[in-house]
């Protein structure tokens, strides 16, 4: 008797779905890069929720989450099959970041400073990006994932506070009349990020990133970032946001359907610069007591100019009364590592900035402003804050790394399109 052909198709449908997802993971670097970037946000949130809880083998929640997320990223990275070559721009960028990590971790060991186990994930993460470079669209997707994770944990922390499950911390009083006239006196919001001076620049990143995107992403990220800037009342974030917007206007020939006039492209950064210097000269010449801290840090750096004094040296200055207890970091992108890691650390950091700057400039000349805008925003943050612990791939480090990666990816794509 002849065989009757089966007409039901579920197995084939299932197999086609599996093939679709498998092929998608093989063709795009977005999944693994999104996992790398989003994990640092989730780890930060876990540490906020359970700051003293020991979860596994003596390790706190944030460390455990970081390793789990890294493991997921490794699996996704293994499935990815890139078709692009590894361009020179990526080599310089990844090499500069790796050198900075080696210097800062090595000097931390020399000084006897403590650091957690997630520091060892930085070099493997950089190697993953170097060995299997994501495409430019994949990097934008990863940036969206990172930004969305920031928004979600900010909302979650506020909901937990409303529910009485996890009380938010506030630092000082908010100085925005526009806000306090409506709500009455309220504290400066730090959310799950540990400090208002960390929360504010995260808001600035969200605003700038949102302006670089479109549709619902633009609306969500700009709105969320603006709210965070307002409630955290961080002057640094206001400056960095203004700088990012000014650079976007200056380097982008078009803003959506609007063609940017040359006069506006020149006037925007000039106006921000004049406003900043006017504010410093007339209203706040000490940058909210930053300049006295800088003087002490520079004085202490001279005791060990090459390798710095480390975190232990900063704590010794606090114990001796030379520094106040709140000044446990240098409140400047270069002054803090100068005292902490000496000339070795600062030179390594400047190398990262220079390489990222060259890449961003070349990308801007070829028509993509994202790299230059993000880099300018991050550097403006560093005028009165040092947001990044260079031994980790943390929440504050990702925007700066992303700035360089976007530019390097665009240079690769532009070169490929020319050939």
Where are these regions (language model features)?
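Alpha-helical transmembrane segments of multi-pass inner-membrane proteins
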Residues: 141-172, 177-185, 191-233, 238-251
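Transmembrane alpha-helices of multi-pass inner-membrane enzymes
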Residues: 372-379, 387-419
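Interfacial transmembrane-helix termini
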Residues: 45-68, 83-90, 99-123, 137-138, ...
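A membrane-periplasm/extracellular boundary helix in multi-pass inner-membrane enzymes
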Residues: 2, 156-164, 249-288, 298-302
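Hydrophobic transmembrane alpha-helices and their immediate junctions
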Residues: 3, 14, 259, 343-379, ...
